[in-house]
Swiss-Prot record:
Official protein name in the record: DNA-directed RNA polymerase subunit beta''
SUPFAM superfamilies the record matches: beta and beta-prime subunits of DNA dependent RNA-polymerase
EC numbers, comma separated: 2.7.7.6
GO cellular component, one term: DNA-directed RNA polymerase complex
Claim: Plastid is one of the keywords in the record: yes
GO biological process, one term: DNA-templated transcription
UniProt keyword list: Chloroplast, DNA-directed RNA polymerase, Metal-binding, Nucleotidyltransferase, Plastid, Transcription, Transferase, Zinc
Length: 1383
C-alpha cells in the first residue's frame, strides 16, 4: 500500500466513520475481492480483542457534569426575571412561553456539548463514553439524559411542557418530574407502535413512484446542472454532495483547465477543489436529465456499491425508494431513543468583538423599532446594516444581515462578547412552522378596559371579537360582580355602602294576601369571626339562626387619652368620638393592654342600649377552678342577673333585674376530669400533699382532701384545701352542703378570725363507716366598686350628662351563684366583666326609630396616624319599613337586607338565593349591554392598599419605631371615601376628613388648630374617549375600599409634589406596576387612578395583559369578565419540535406535500415574487416561462434540503441522488392554465414538464402553465401505466377510466411486467437486447439555439440571480436556491 495512504490511518482511533473511509479507500486501490479479504481479517481481530477485553457498565460510571449546578441556577434566574416582566405587563404569555422554552433548551444543549469534553478530560476510558461515542449502542442524547438533564418534554399532543425536568436519570426524578417524564415516554411508546406500519407504507409508496426509472442511456446531452459552492455549506456536506457526481461544465483555474465536462468526481478531485477554493461548481443531476421516463448514466453518476459509473439497465429508481424508506423503519424502531424530549432551534447571535462605542446609520428607512420574539425592545433592520465599533485603537466593522434585530442603541457603549444583534431563525423557509392559537384566560373577575383603539374583524362584525392594530395593554379592573334577576328596582344605589359578609339575595315575590309575617321563617348564615351560634326567639319576630360577628378594636392606653382630650373637646351634638388603636400598632409601640374591647355589630348600626364595649378588669381574674358565692345562703336577698338579648346582630342590654351586691366570694378548688379507664392512685376522702401523683400522668398542684365522683363523662377528682375539724356534737352542724361565713362575723380576737380574715366556707363531709368531720375552706373576697371611673378611661367630655348620647357602665358577674367554674388548659378565668352601654334620649320630634351609627375617622399628623371611632345618631332607612322600597332612599346594605319587617305584607313567599360577599364595599353602577339582566359589580376589600412615607415620628415615653418607607398598611373596613359608614344621601357629606394645620410633638401627642373639611372628590369612571360614564341604573358595580391603593405624597416638598403629580397622574389613567409616580421610589402595584387629592392618589388595582398587533380581544369595553373567561387570543408561528418520533411524519409530509405544511404557502409567495420581478430582470419575452422554470428548480432544491435535514438530524446518511430521483417525479407535472393551449391540452390538465416544453416548441406558440406539486400518492396514480396505478390503489376506478379512455399501457416499468408475468426490462445484461437504430445514429446532434440561450441566461449571470433570489425569498445565503445542504 502506498505510504501516503498508510499515514491516513496511522495511530488513530478507528470508529465507525474511519471504518467507512478505510473501506472506500481499499475498494479504490484493490478492488472488491481484496477488500473483502482484508475486512475479514479486521473482523477476526475485532472479535478476538472484544473477547479478551470485556466492558462492564455500572451506575458509578455515570458522571454528572460539574457545571450543571450553576447552569441550571442561571436558567432559573432568567425564568424568574421573565415571570416578573410578565407580571408587570412587559411581555405577553406567548413571548414568555417561547423564551422560557428557549432558555431551558439552550441550557440543556450546552450541558450536552459539555458532556463529551468532560468525559475526555476526567475519564476517557469510561464505559458509557466508549459505548455511546463508538456508535455501538446509545448516542449523545441518551447519555445526556443519564448524566446531564432530561430537559423539556412534549406531551402526547406534541405540545411543549414549559416545566423542564432539571434532574437526570442518574440523580433520580421528583414526583412532578416523573409524571412529566411519563408524558413523553408514553408518547414514544405509542409512536413506536403506530409508526412502524407507517414506515413500511412509506417505502411502498416511494417504490411505486420511481419503479420505472432505469438507466437507459449513457448521455442525454443536457447542458444544465446545479451549482454547488464550498462557501455556502459545511465542508463535510460539500464532500458528500460532490463525490460520485459528474461535472456539467469544465473547471478552470485562471486559464488552466483542471477538470473537464462529463468527468466523474472522486476524493482527489474534491480535495483539489477545496484547496483551490474554486467557486460554483456545476454538476449534473437527475433534475436536469432530458430523458422523459428514464435516466442517463452521467446525470446519475457513480454506483453506490462500487466506485464506477452506474451501468446501463440498473434499476436506480427502486434503489432510491428503498434508500429513503428503509431508514424510516429504523427511525421508528429508535423512537424510545429520547422518549419525547424536545429539540428545537434558537436564533443566532452577533457578539461584539471588543469593548467600545457602537455606531450605525440610524435611518428610518434602514431600521425601525420592533419587538423581538421574546418581547424585548429592538431595532429591526430592513436591509444590510453596517455597524462600527470604536475601541481605543481599533475600528471593528460588522454587517448585520436584513430581518435581524439590533439589540443596542446608537452610540451605546458595549462590552466584549455582548450580544448586539439577533439573526432571526424564523425567516428561513426550511424550518417547520405551524400557526398556533394561544388563548389567555382571566385569573380574576373584573371590568375589561383597553388603552388603544380596536377594530372589528370583518368576519366578526356583529360580535364581541376585536382585533388590535398596535401593541397595547388590556386591563382587568378588579371588582366582584353579582347578577340580580329580580325586580327592576334595586336595593342598591350608586355609591351605596355594603357591609362585611353582606349577601345579595335574588328574590321573586308571588302576590298572596293570606300569609302574614308570623308564618314566614328565615335563616341567615354569615361567616363568623367568633364561631358562636345563638338561637334566640324574640317576641314579635320569627326565628333567626344567626352567627354573631364582632370586630374587636382595643382602646389606646388611658393616660394618652387624658392628655389627648383637647382633640375631642369640640364635638357636635349626637356624636361620640373614641380613639382606637389596632392590636398590631399597640404591639409595635409596646403599650400595655388596657383590656377594653369595642364590639361593633356587623352592619355598624347600634340600637338603643346596645353594648358598645366591654372591659375585663385584671383584678377579677383567677387561674384556678372554684365556686362563686354572692353571700351566705341565709344572709343575701334573692338576686337575679340581668340578661343579654341578641337582637339582629347587636348585643343589647336589658336591665330586667338590677344587681344589689357590692362584693362576692370565690372558693378555689382543684378539679381533674379523668377518663373512666384511667387508674386513680388516691382514695376518696384521703388527704394528700402538694405534687402528689393522683393518676398515671397527673400530679396535684395543691394539697388537701380528695373527693372522687363518677360521672357520665368520666371521673371527677376534686382536691379541697383547708383544715379539718372533728366536732363534738354532730347535731349542731347544718346538714346543708356548705355555709359561707363572711369576714367579720366570728369572734373578733380569736385566732381563727385572724386566720380567716377573708371569710371561710364550711363544708360537712360524711365518709362511709367513719366519723363525720367538717372542712374549713379558704375564701377569696372580691369587692365590686360602684362602677369604673369613666374619667379614668375616657376624656371628661364623654361623661357629660347634658348631651343626649350617653355611656352607661354596668358590672356583670359572668358566673351564677354557687355554680362551679372549671378552668380550661391553664387559661385565666374572668369573673366580672364591665359593659359599656350606649344610650341616648329619644328625640320627641321624630317618631321613627333612631339608631347610632359607627364609623372610623383617621387623623394624620405628620406621618403619625391616629384612628377614632365615631358614633353618630342617624335615622337608618333599614330600620324604617316605610323607606324600604323607596327608590330615592339609599343607605347601608346590612346583613339582613330582606328582614321580614321590611317586606310588605302584600308580598310574601320570598324565595332567596344567597351569594355571600367578602368584605365591606361600595356599589358602583356598570354599563351593561343587556338591559334584561342587571348586574352588580362589587369591588372587594382585599385589593386595596395604600403607600406612604411614614417617617419623622418622634414622641417621648411612647416607644414607636418609624415605620419603613413605602410600607403597605391595610385600610380599615370603614375608612376613607369608599368606607365612611354614613348613608349616602348628600354626596358632599360622603367624604369626611379631619385635617390639621400644625402639630406640636411634646411629651404627649397634641394636635392643635383642628378643623373639619369636606372634600367633594373627582370620582368617576372614564370611558376610552375620556367622557364620564352615564351609568345604567339597572346594573351595578360594588366597589370595596380594599380594592383601592392609597399613595401618599411626601410632605416635605408639599407644594412641588402637588404640581408634579398633577402633571404626571390624571384621573382614569392606568399605571403599570414598578412605574414611578413620585420621587420616593417606584409604585408597587398596577391599577387605574380613581381619586386624585392634594396629597394622595387612590388607585383601583388592575391586572394588565400585554397584547401585540393581530391579537384578538374577546369582550366589549367595560364588560364584566369572570374568572376563567377568555381575554385575548394570540396567533403565532411555532417551530414544530424536532423530536425523533416526529422525523418520519415530517418526511411523509414533505413527500405528500400536505396542505398543513408551510411548503405550499411559501411556494405560492415565491411564484408571485418571481412573476413580479422576472420581467425587470430578464426582459419580457421569456419572463413567464423562466419564472415557472425557476420556481420548479427552487421547489425541488427546497424539498431535497428538507428531507435531508430530517435524516441528517438523526445521523442517517442518504445520498442526495436518491432523494433527487423521488423529488424529480413529484415535481415533473405542470398544470395547464385556463387560457393556454386549448387546442392541444384541456384547461387545468396535468401534463409532464418536458412534454409541455416540447409541445410548445413544436407548435411554436407560448404555453401558459403553473408549477404544481403532487404528493407521492397522487404521483403514483398519475403515471403512464394504468396497470401500475390499478395495482396500487382504487383499482376499479382506475381500470374503468382506462377502459373508457382507451388507454394503452406500453409495459415500460417493472411493476406492469410483474403483474402480467412478462420479462422485467431491468438488469445490467438487458443492454444486449436494446439496439440503437441506424436512423438514430444518423441524426446530427445540433445544440438548439433555445437551449444555448437558456444556458446563457441561467448560468452566465449568477450574481444577478443570487441577489434577486436572496432578496425575494428571504433566505439566508446558505439556503440559496442552487444549494444542496441542510443548514
Amino acid at each position: 500500500m502506498d505510504e501516503g495512504v498508510n499515514l491516513v490511518f496511522h495511530k488513530k482511533v478507528i470508529d465507525g466513520t474511519a471504518i467507512k473511509r478505510l473501506i472506500s479507500r481499499l475498494i479504490d486501490h484493490f478492488g472488491m475481492a481484496h477488500t473483502s479479504h482484508i475486512l475479514d481479517q479486521v473482523k477476526t481481530l475485532g472479535f478476538q480483542q472484544a473477547t479478551a477485553t470485556s466492558i462492564s457498565l455500572g451506575i458509578d460510571d455515570l458522571l454528572t457534569i460539574p457545571s450543571k449546578g450553576w447552569l441550571v441556577q442561571d436558567a432559573e434566574q432568567q425564568s424568574l426575571s421573565l415571570e416578573k416582566h410578565h407580571h408587570y405587563g412587559n411581555v405577553h404569555a406567548v413571548e414568555k412561553l417561547r423564551q422560557s422554552i428557549e432558555v431551558w433548551y439552550a441550557t440543556s444543549e450546552y450541558l450536552r456539548q459539555e458532556m463529551n469534553p468532560n468525559f475526555r478530560m476526567t475519564d476517557p476510558f469510561n464505559p458509557v463514553h466508549i459505548m455511546s461515542f463508538s456508535g455501538a449502542r446509545g448516542n449523545a442524547s441518551q447519555v445526556h439524559q443519564l448524566v446531564g438533564m432530561r430537559g423539556l418534554m412534549s406531551d402526547p399532543q406534541g405540545q411543549m411542557i414549559d416545566l423542564p425536568i432539571q434532574s437526570n436519570l442518574r440523580e433520580g426524578l421528583s414526583l412532578t418530574e416523573y409524571i412529566i417524564s411519563c408524558y413523553g415516554a408514553r408518547k414514544g411508546v405509542v409512536d413506536t407502535a403506530v409508526r412502524t406500519s407507517d414506515a413500511g407504507y412509506l417505502t411502498r409508496r416511494l417504490v411505486e413512484v420511481v419503479q420505472h426509472i432505469v438507466v437507459r442511456r449513457t448521455d442525454c446531452g443536457t447542458l444544465r446542472g446545479i451549482s454547488v459552492s464550498p462557501r455556502r455549506m459545511p465542508e463535510r456536506i460539500f464532500i458528500q454532495t460532490l463525490i460520485g457526481r459528474v461535472l456539467a461544465d469544465d473547471i478552470y483555474i485562471g486559464s488552466r483547465c483542471i477538470a473537464i465536462r462529463n468527468q466523474d468526481i472522486g476524493i482527489g478531485l474534491v480535495n483539489r477543489f477545496i484547496s483551490f477554493r474554486i467557486q460554483p461548481i456545476s454538476i449534473r443531476t437527475p433534475f436536469t436529465c432530458r430523458s422523459t421516463s428514464w435516466i442517463c448514466r452521467l446525470c446519475y453518476g457513480r454506483s453506490p456499491t462500487h466506485g464506477d459509473l452506474v451501468e446501463l439497465g440498473e434499476a436506480v429508481g427502486i434503489i432510491a425508494g428503498q434508500s429513503i424508506g428503509e431508514p424510516g423503519t429504523q427511525l421508528t424502531l429508535r423512537t424510545f431513543h429520547t422518549g419525547g424530549v424536545f429539540t428545537g432551534g434558537t436564533a443566532e447571535h452577533v457578539r461584539a468583538p471588543s469593548n467600545g462605542k457602537i455606531k450605525f446609520n440610524f435611518n428610518e428607512a434602514l431600521v425601525h423599532p420592533a419587538r423581538t420574539r421574546h418581547g424585548h425592545p429592538a431595532l429591526l433592520c430592513s436591509m444590510d446594516l453596517d455597524v462600527t465599533i470604536e475601541s481605543e485603537d481599533i475600528l471593528h466593522n460588522l454587517t448585520i444581515p436584513p430581518k435581524s434585530f439590533l439589540l443596542v442603541q446608537n452610540n451605546q457603549y458595549v462590552e466584549s462578547e455582548q450580544v448586539i444583534a439577533e439573526i432571526c431563525a424564523g425567516t428561513s423557509t426550511f424550518h417547520f412552522k405551524e400557526r398556533v392559537r394561544k388563548h389567555i384566560y382571566s385569573d380574576s373577575e373584573g371590568e375589561m378596559h383597553w388603552s388603544t383603539d380596536v377594530y372589528h374583524a370583518p368576519e366578526f362584525t356583529y360580535s364581541n371579537v376585536h382585533l388590535l392594530p398596535k401593541t397595547s395593554h388590556l386591563w382587568i379592573l378588579s371588582g366582584g360582580s353579582c347578577r340580580s334577576r329580580g325586580a327592576p328596582f334595586s336595593l342598591h344605589k350608586d355609591q351605596d355602602q355594603m357591609n362585611p359578609r353582606s349577601t345579595e339575595r335574588e328574590r321573586r315575590y308571588l302576590s298572596s294576601l293570606s300569609a302574614n309575617n308570623d308564618q314566614i321563617r328565615y335563616k341567615f348564615f354569615s361567616s363568623s369571626f367568633s364561631g358562636k351560634k345563638k338561637d334566640d326567639r324574640s317576641p314579635g319576630y320569627s326565628e333567626m339562626n344567626r352567627i354573631i360577628c364582632t370586630l374587636h378594636c382595643n382602646l389606646i392606653y388611658p393616660s394618652i387619652l387624658r392628655e389627648n382630650s383637647d382633640l375631642l373637646a369640640k364635638r357636635r351634638r349626637n356624636r361620640l368620638v373614641i380613639p382606637v388603636q389596632s392590636s398590631q400598632e399597640r404591639e409595635k409601640e409596646l403599650i400595655p393592654h388596657s383590656g377594653i374591647s369595642i364590639e361593633l355589630p356587623i352592619n355598624g348600626i347600634f340600637r338603643k342600649k346596645s353594648i358598645l364595649a366591654f372591659f375585663d378588669d385584671p383584678r377579677y381574674r383567677t387561674k384556678s377552678s372554684g365556686i362563686t358565692q354572692y353571700e351566705t345562703m341565709g344572709m343575701h336577698s334573692i338576686v337575679k342577673k340581668e340578661g343579654l338579648v341578641d337582637y339582629r346582630g347587636i348585643n343589647e342590654f336589658k336591665p330586667k333585674y338590677q344587681m344589689t351586691i357590692d362584693r362576692f366570694f370565690f372558693i378555689p378548688e382543684e378539679v381533674h376530669i379523668l377518663p373512666e379507664s384511667s387508674s386513680i392512685m388516691v382514695r376518696n376522702n384521703s388527704l394528700i400533699g402538694v405534687d402528689t401523683r393522683i393518676a398515671l400522668n397527673t400530679r396535684s398542684r395543691a394539697g388537701g382532701l380528695v373527693r372522687v365522683e363518677r360521672k357520665k363523662r368520666g371521673i371527677a377528682l376534686q382536691i379541697f384545701s383547708g383544715t379539718i375539724h372533728f366536732p363534738g356534737e354532730t347535731d349542731k352542724i347544718s346538714w346543708d352542703s356548705g355555709i359561707l361565713i363572711p369576714p367579720g362575723t366570728g369572734k373578733r380576737n380569736s385566732k381563727e378570725s385572724k386566720k380567716w380574715k377573708n371569710g371561710i366556707y364550711v363544708q360537712r363531709i360524711t365518709p362511709t363507716k367513719k366519723k363525720h368531720f367538717v372542712l374549713f375552706r379558704p375564701v377569696v373576697t372580691y369587692e365590686i366598686a360602684d362602677g369604673l371611673n369613666l374619667a379614668r378611661l375616657f376624656p371628661p367630655d364623654l361623661c357629660q350628662e347634658k348631651d343626649n348620647m350617653q355611656l352607661q357602665i354596668v358590672n356583670y358577674i359572668v358566673y351564677g351563684n354557687g355554680k362551679p367554674i372549671r378552668e380550661i388548659s391553664d387559661t385565666s378565668i374572668q369573673l366580672v366583666r364591665t359593659w359599656f352601654i350606649l344610650n341616648w334620649d329619644q328625640d320627641k320630634k321624630s317618631a321613627s326609630a333612631e339608631a347610632a351609627h359607627a364609623s372610623f375617622v383617621e387623623v394624620r399628623a405628620k406621618g403619625l396616624i391616629r384612628d377614632f371611632l365615631r358614633i353618630d345618631l342617624v335615622k337608618s332607612p333599614i330600620l324604617d319599613p316605610r323607606k324600604r322600597n323607596d327608590p330615592s332612599g339609599s343607605g347601608l346594605i346590612s346583613d339582613n337586607v330582606s328582614d321580614h319587617t321590611n317586606i310588605n305584607p302584600f308580598y310574601s313567599k320570598p324565595k332567596m338565593k344567597q351569594s355571600p360577599r367578602q368584605n365591606h364595599g361600595t356599589i358602583r353602577t356598570l354599563l351593561n349591554q343587556n338591559k334584561e339582566c342587571p348586574s352588580l359589580m362589587i369591588l372587594s376589600a382585599s385589593n386595596c392598599f395604600r403607600m406612604g412615607p411614614f417617617n419623622d415620628v418622634k414622641s417621648q415615653n411612647v416607644i414607636k419605631e418609624s415605620i419603613k418607607k413605602d410600607a403597605i398598611i391595610q385600610i380599615r373596613n370603614s375608612i376613607g371615601p369608599l368606607g365612611t359608614a354614613l348613608q349616602v344621601v348628600n354626596f358632599d357629606s360622603f367624604y369626611y376628613f379631619i385635617t390639621h394645620n400644625q402639630v406640636l410633638l411634646t411629651k404627649y401627642l397634641q394636635v392643635e388648630n383642628l378643623k373639619q373639611t369636606f372634600q367633594v372628590l373627582q370620582y368617576y369612571l372614564m370611558d376610552e374617549s375620556g367622557r364620564i360614564y352615564n351609568p345604567d341604573p339597572r346594573s351595578n358595580i360594588v366597589l370595596n375600599s380594599f380594592n383601592l391603593s392609597w399613595y401618599f405624597l411626601p410632605h416635605n416638598n408639599y407644594e412641588n409634589s402637588c404640581e408634579e403629580i398633577s402633571t404626571i397622574v390624571s384621573l382614569g389613567q392606568f399605571i403599570c406596576e414598578n412605574g414611578c409616580i413620585a420621587k420616593n421610589g417606584p409604585y408597587l402595584r398596577s391599577g387605574q387612578v380613581l381619586i386624585v387629592q392634594l396629597d394622595s392618589v387612590v388607585i383601583r388595582s388592575a391586572k394588565p395583559y400585554l397584547a401585540t398587533p393581530g391579537a384578538t380581544v374577546h369582550g366589549h369595553y367595560g364588560e364584566i369578565l369572570y374568572d376563567g373567561d377568555t381575554v385575548v387570543t394570540f396567533l403565532y408561528e411555532k417551530s414544530r419540535s424536532g423530536d425523533i418520533t416526529q422525523g418520519l411524519p415530517k418526511v411523509e409530509q414533505v413527500l405528500e406535500v400536505r396542505s398543513v405544511d408551510s411548503i405550499s404557502v411559501n411556494l405560492e409567495k415565491r411564484v408571485e415574487n418571481w412573476n413580479e420581478h422576472i420581467t425587470r430582470i430578464l426582459g419580457f419575452p421569456w419572463g413567464f416561462l423562466i419564472g415557472a422554470e425557476l420556481t420548479i428548480v427552487q421547489s425541488r432544491i427546497s424539498l431535497v434540503n428538507k428531507i435531508q435535514k430530517v435524516y441528517r438530524s438523526q445521523g442517517v446518511q442518504i445520498h442526495n441522488r436518491h432523494i433527487e430521483i423521488i423529488v424529480r417525479q413529484i415535481t415533473s407535472k405542470v398544470l395547464v392554465s385556463e387560457d393556454g393551449m386549448s387546442n392541444v391540452f384541456l384547461p387545468r390538465e396535468l401534463i409532464g414538464l418536458l412534454r409541455a416544453e416540447r409541445t410548445g416548441r413544436a407548435l411554436e406558440e407560448s404555453i401558459c402553465y403553473k408549477a404544481f406539486l403532487l404528493g407521492i400518492t397522487r404521483t403514483s396514480l398519475n403515471t403512464q401505466s394504468f396497470i401500475s396505478e390499478a395495482s396500487f390503489q382504487e383499482t376499479a376506478r382506475v381500470l374503468a377510466k382506462a377502459a373508457l379512455r382507451g388507454r394503452i399501457d406500453w409495459l415500460k416499468g417493472l411493476k406492469e411486467n410483474v403483474v402480467i408475468g412478462g420479462m422485467i426490462p431491468v438488469g445490467t445484461g438487458f443492454k444486449g437486447l436494446v439496439h440503437c437504430s441506424k436512423q438514430h445514429k444518423s441524426i446530427p446532434k445540433n445544440k438548439h439555439f433555445f437551449e444555448g440561450e437558456i444556458r446563457d441566461i441561467l448560468f452566465h449571470h449568477r450574481e444577478l440571480f443570487d441577489s434577486c433570489i436572496s432578496k425575494n425569498f428571504h433566505d439566508t445565503p446558505e439556503q440559496s436556491f442552487r444549494v444542496f445542504n441542510d443548514s
